[in-house]
Amino acid sequence: VSVTTVSIIINGKAEERKISAATQERVAEAMRDLGYQPNLSARRLRSQENERPVIAFFWPLDYRVSILASFLNFIQIEIAESGFDCEMMIQTYENDKLEQYGTTFLKNGYSGAIIGACSAKDQQWLEGICPRMPVILINRESEHFSTVCTDNDEVGLMAATKIRQKGYTEAAIFASRHSYFATSQRVQAFISSCERLGIETDEKYILKGSSTRNGGYEIGKQYAALKEPPKMIFCDSDAIALGALRAFHEEGISVPGDAELLSIGMLDPEAASYYVPSLSVVEMPNKEIGQQVLRLMRKKVLNNDISSEHVKVHAKLMLRESFS
């Protein structure tokens, strides 16, 4: 295969130049074997669409991927309403291994990058390479990059304050066994707020499992087996809370009669609203975060601005049947 033919195939003009499917497959196989990555910057310079910004959106491929759809939906709405004509490239990555995927997009020259739910290790690596493009972190703090985030201390205090107002002096905690950065910060903020407000959170009543409905179901079963556990329960995710509610139903634990649940709300609000009983949450403002991320990225890209800028959005307390 000639160099010219390879170039035509790489640049997506094989059909136009009537190059056979067999030849296209041979070139594709060679590219896979060599680990070849097309130079997107050069391609865009040759393209008639070189003025159209391309934004990379990185998100970890674990249980949190269910949250990605929510952010994408709100970002897409904001793109349409703002008229920002950009291309969004989605790249999932393994937690703590952003470097494995990140090197490629940094070399290929995207117009900007949105990084969601990165670990402390991933953030440290990213700050060490100083990419020359606008970078926005979701729900993280950084001096190097722009951020759009909620205040984890505010979230913890909001939950603890409402629990104390109802007269509770002790609370159980249902939490993820994996110490994901923002989640663990919110739990710690809740515990610290409880200490200040006179609410006991005994270690033996901090029950952990996977951050899924099944994990919550198993935690709910553990709680049901305890002798006289706290009636008040704080859950670090609505996935865990919904699973626990199923276990409570099977164990004959009435909510809110025998136990009350308040959770961090990360999923689609309808998931909590239409469950029986409906779930009370400190709702993370995914819609506002998505809107602010896109607005900030648009401003940075159009002004060729890589300086850091920080936007705070506020969580909301949504009281329903499980705790009011």
Where are these regions (language model features)?
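Short acidic/polar active-site loop segments enriched in Thr and Asp
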Residues: 111, 168-170, 229-231
